[in-house]
């Protein structure tokens, strides 16, 4: 099986996009994703149609799929200008298990409680884990992506950098349309073709998506997240989820014999992980992602934050200090676009503006001295 994140644009792209100083979102606004004429793409599509037909795609489906499709140069720009984000676990968890993400997750757990309990009963995957995946993948449906999937995948396949992979996803998208699960207009997602509340790529959709509502369609694009949540549980279940076993937790706080004890950041908490931790990594092959999902699920369920401290960073500032620095900068008129304690481009720009306005050396770097200078 192709891991649904083999094409990943970085560590938890949707998650990072939601960060105060996060990266560009995994899906650009539709207004920026406008098709432009491209003779090369036209020729590629003409040839692809024959290949799609040879794999059982009807002419009607092909015609419907490409009726409004086009070449999207912004997709190529994003694919060629990816940045691999290497955040510390502390920063990652500050985003993944932020107060807002926890409280919203708890609201969603309550709102969809009955159906989530049914999903948990059928697939054996903790409902809090399913909600946590939803929270990290699309911010509980707020960032599902609005890029036309057929246009995005055909553009990427034509470009050729990972042409074979994206063509396989495009064929899978054609099969989804042919099955009647959605329409070309409704088949939207990220610029890389990940779709729905929990960001399934087309091949994973074909293999794992389920119709939990019983309406005859596996509708992961609907405002109703039921099919998406059930599909995520089905995916994790088939990946080997062990019913009733924890994903892990801070060492010394979970019972049972873990398969490993990790300490991704020193100083920082030691994380005891069980088999279900590896199952989460089948969704996104990253230790930080799996810890983020697991810890967020625990917090949604009412669990406590990790006890062990990460300590100050290289600048001498703790997470609490960095949040306070962002608040003070914003209060002084230098907006950091929020206060999550993660130092990124917005905070660096605010620091630079403050330094410039006050006759200081412009570095954009946080420091204990800067925090003190900003006062209370």
Residues of each region from the PLM?
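Compositionally biased, proline/threonine/alanine/serine-rich low-complexity intrinsically disordered stretches
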Residues: 19-39, 63, 310, 328-331, ...
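Acidic/His-rich structured neighborhood in mature extracellular/periplasmic domains
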Residues: 90-230
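Short acidic, glycine/serine/threonine-rich helix-capping segments at coil-helix boundaries
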Residues: 317-322, 330-376
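Sec-exported extracytoplasmic/periplasmic mature domains
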Residues: 49-58, 67-71, 121-124, 135-139, ...
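Acidic, Ser/Thr/Pro/Gly-enriched interdomain connector segments
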Residues: 274-290, 295-341
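An acidic, Gly/Ser/Thr/Pro-rich helix-cap/linker signature
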Residues: 20-120
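Flexible, glycine-rich surface segments
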Residues: 184, 188-283, 288-290
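N-terminal export signals
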Residues: 2-25
């Amino acid at each position: 099986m192709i891991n649904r994140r083999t094409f990943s644009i970085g560590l938890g792209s949707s998650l990072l996009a939601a960060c105060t100083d996060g990266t560009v979102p995994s899906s650009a606004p539709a207004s920026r994703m406008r098709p432009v004429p491209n003779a090369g793409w036209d020729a590629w599509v003409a040839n692809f149609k024959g290949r799609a037909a040879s794999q059982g795609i009807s002419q009607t489906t092909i015609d419907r799929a490409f009726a409004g499709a086009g070449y999207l140069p912004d997709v190529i720009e994003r694919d060629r200008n990816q940045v691999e984000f290497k955040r510390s676990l502390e920063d990652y968890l500050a985003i993944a298990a932020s107060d807002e993400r926890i409280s919203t997750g708890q609201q969603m757990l309550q709102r969809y409680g009955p159906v989530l309990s049914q999903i948990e009963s059928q697939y054996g995957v903790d409902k809090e884990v399913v909600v946590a995946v939803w929270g990290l993948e699309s911010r509980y449906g707020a960032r599902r992506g609005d890029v036309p999937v057929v246009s995005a995948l055909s553009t990427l396949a034509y470009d050729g950098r990972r042409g074979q992979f994206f063509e396989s996803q495009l064929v899978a998208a054609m099969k989804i349309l042919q099955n009647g699960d959605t329409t070309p207009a409704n088949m939207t997602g990220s610029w890389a073709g990940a779709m729905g509340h929990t960001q399934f790529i087309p091949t994973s959709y074909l293999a794992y998506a389920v119709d939990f509502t019983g309406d005859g369609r596996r509708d992961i694009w609907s405002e109703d997240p039921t099919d998406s949540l059930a599909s995520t549980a089905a995916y994790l279940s088939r990946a080997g989820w062990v019913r009733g076993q924890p994903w892990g937790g801070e060492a010394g706080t979970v019972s049972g014999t873990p398969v490993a004890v990790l300490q991704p950041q020193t100083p920082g908490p030691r994380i005891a992980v069980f088999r279900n931790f590896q199952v989460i990594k089948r969704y996104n092959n990253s230790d930080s992602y799996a810890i983020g999902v697991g810890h967020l699920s625990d917090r949604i369920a009412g669990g406590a934050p990790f006890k062990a401290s990460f300590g100050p960073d290289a600048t001498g500032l703790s997470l609490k200090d960095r949040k306070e620095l962002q608040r003070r900068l914003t209060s002084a008129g230098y907006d950091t676009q929020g206060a999550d304690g993660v130092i990124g481009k917005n905070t660096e720009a605010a620091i630079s503006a403050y330094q410039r306005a006050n006759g200081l050396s412009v570095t954009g770097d946080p420091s204990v001295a800067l925090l003190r200078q900003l006062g209370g």
